[in-house]
Amino acid sequence: MDQIEAMLCGGGEKTKVAVTTKTLADPLNWGLAADQMKGSHLDEVKKMVEEYRRPVVNLGGETLTIGQVAAISTVGGSVKVELAETSRAGVKASSDWVMESMNKGTDSYGVTTGFGATSHRRTKNGTALQTELIRFLNAGIFGNTKETCHTLPQSATRAAMLVRVNTLLQGYSGIRFEILEAITSLLNHNISPSLPLRGTITASGDLVPLSYIAGLLTGRPNSKATGPDGESLTAKEAFEKAGISTGFFDLQPKEGLALVNGTAVGSGMASMVLFEANVQAVLAEVLSAIFAEVMSGKPEFTDHLTHRLKHHPGQIEAAAIMEHILDGSSYMKLAQKVHEMDPLQKPKQDRYALRTSPQWLGPQIEVIRQATKSIEREINSVNDNPLIDVSRNKAIHGGNFQGTPIGVSMDNTRLAIAAIGKLMFAQFSELVNDFYNNGLPSNLTASSNPSLDYGFKGAEIAMASYCSELQYLANPVTSHVQSAEQHNQDVNSLGLISSRKTSEAVDILKLMSTTFLVGICQAVDLRHLEENLRQTVKNTVSQVAKKVLTTGINGELHPSRFCEKDLLKVVDREQVFTYVDDPCSATYPLMQRLRQVIVDHALSNGETEKNAVTSIFQKIGAFEEELKAVLPKEVEAARAAYGNGTAPIPNRIKECRSYPLYRFVREELGTKLLTGEKVVSPGEEFDKVFTAMCEGKLIDPLMDCLKEWNGAPIPIC
């Protein structure tokens, strides 16, 4: 620590004020902000998850993280809060200063004056003033019907309590340490005050909701809380369950203002939202890579040179992550072989939803990352008014309660979330559409009778609904500011409103990523089924060709024997699901193409075709009859083997870096291939994945997909 000289408010005498060397070198904080953006986004998310899983959150005022807020917000969780004992002296000093200054007759806002536009009023009854502050701010509406809920979720309340305590620990607010200990006891005993969902403009802080925390601490008769088992508690019952032996607090001058005049509700909820948004951003990157796998895409879109020439770090990282997933992928090796067959008859490039996914996701990741840093600064800030500067013996009147960083960050995050959802919808729409999905069945149907199986059709409709609502939520909140409180609060951040809307948005994005993930797993299984069915068809066509086409009537070698190689090429080229529900149908492409091969050979048979013994045309009927007798049974047997887990060709996904995610959905959650022949609906499987996602169980398999990534693109050779 270095020291700089500062003049006391009365002038004349100078005092030494401790300032970190880093502050002197970076007085505007831009350097620190830039330093915080170093390293990869993925590493940052991993660190966030690590902090989320720590058993204890040690609060000291300046090191609280998004992951820690998310951990404490978990209702019924086991993570505990501990207050840094080193903060006690600073907190006490500011509290003592308020009492001493009032005794000396110092005129301070919110201590001897009225509030806001009526701060011209004066009183010497500081305790009564704080009591009245809490009373008039208890202006929220809860309602008492089951159809509507106007109560802030417990998770958001817990986040707000944690963030507010963190702010007050820094010793600039004039509040007793014992009050902070009481809030901590409530947190550690899973007791949450009931806060109204609406009623704050997050400037002057989140006055209305925070007043209900103060109301519980002071034992207001209208105060309620929710206990560890979800039971409703009075203030008295809440104190008893939390083991707070001091009884209700009689607020001293400034303490009511210290409790309510801050941005903790908006920034607390923003922290929860950003934890989820960061995980969803990584999931979107990985899902885009798996989408490329099941779509038989071309991995060229991840080539590092393309993205290095664009310069944007979010894009470069998104591409590098996808490149890592696709590097060595068994699907990509197979896709390359497929693309090499008849290349001039296929699109040269994949569609935008696949090919430009790094360019699309990159800016969204940058926005979410920037918002994360902004909110992390906010939850470690001192954001009430006035600020008590004991070192300079003065109360500083300012506006740190203005939650603009929250409103702006949440608006930006919500826009990014909407863009991620739009990409997922575009990818999902391609996945279920047999015009675009490179051979997968329409609607990802898996039954032998597609006329009675419509697969993910309902899911696609639901995805359109989710995406539409998400795009609507992308509209900004901060452009709807209204002048409030007798035009004193004439500009205000709407931070909590924006956080709430972003919470809604991330919840909808989770619905979309859930649906997309289950759809991708369905596609993985269909590719597995496709391979086994194709091999069965190849084997059967080969056997029938050998039996029917090799020899003539008298056992002599027949010219038609040369058809077999070209017949097998047809099977390789033809998309299995275009014919496999009725493989020998004359209206389906397989039989048409096979017949065409034999016809072409017959036309090139020359003079020998005129001889009935050597005529290839004469073999067409026998070949088709034999195939009709054998192929449907073999296909049915192949489906049965696949269904009971004895398919001869293993699932390629097991050879891919994306396997941990698939394994989690299929094995750990117990979801199955969806078919019209089964009773299970898509929504039932979606619920399993969505619930696991909301419980944070998807994080480990997601990170397992990337555990070998070294944080850099594959070198350009």
Curated annotation (Swiss-Prot):
Post-translational modification (record): Contains an active site 4-methylidene-imidazol-5-one (MIO), which is formed autocatalytically by cyclization and dehydration of residues Ala-Ser-Gly.
Residue positions, PTM 2,3-didehydroalanine (Ser): S204
> What compartments host this protein?
Cytoplasm
Q: Thermal effects on activity, per the entry?
A: Optimum temperature is 48 degrees Celsius.
Give the reaction(s) catalysed. L-phenylalanine = (E)-cinnamate + NH4(+)
The UniProt entry lists the main location of this chain as: cytoplasm
EC number(s) per UniProt?
Answer: 4.3.1.24
Q: Where is the active site?
A: Y109
Which keywords, in A-to-Z order, does the entry hold? Cytoplasm, Lyase, Phenylalanine catabolism, Phenylpropanoid metabolism
Q: Which GO terms describe its molecular function?
A: phenylalanine ammonia-lyase activity
Q: Which Gene3D superfamilies match?
A: Fumarase/aspartase (Central domain), Fumarase/aspartase (N-terminal domain), Phenylalanine ammonia-lyase 1, domain 3
Question: How is the activity of this protein governed by pH, according to its UniProt record?
Answer: Optimum pH is 8.4-8.9.
A Gene Ontology term for the protein's cellular component: cytoplasm
InterPro entries named among the record's database cross-references: Aromatic_Lyase, Fumarase/histidase_N, L-Aspartase-like, Phe/His_NH3-lyase_AS, Phe_NH3-lyase, Phe_NH3-lyase_shielding_dom_sf
Q: Where does (E)-cinnamate bind?
A: N261, Q349, R355, N385, K457, E485, N488
Q: Which GO terms describe its biological process?
A: cinnamic acid biosynthetic process; L-phenylalanine catabolic process; phenylpropanoid biosynthetic process; response to oxidative stress
Origin superkingdom: Eukaryota
**Cross-link (5-imidazolinone (Ala-Gly)) at residue(s):** A203-G205
Tell me the subunit arrangement: Homotetramer.
> What family is it from?
Belongs to the PAL/histidase family.
- The entry's protein name is Phenylalanine ammonia-lyase 2
Gene name linked to the record: PAL2
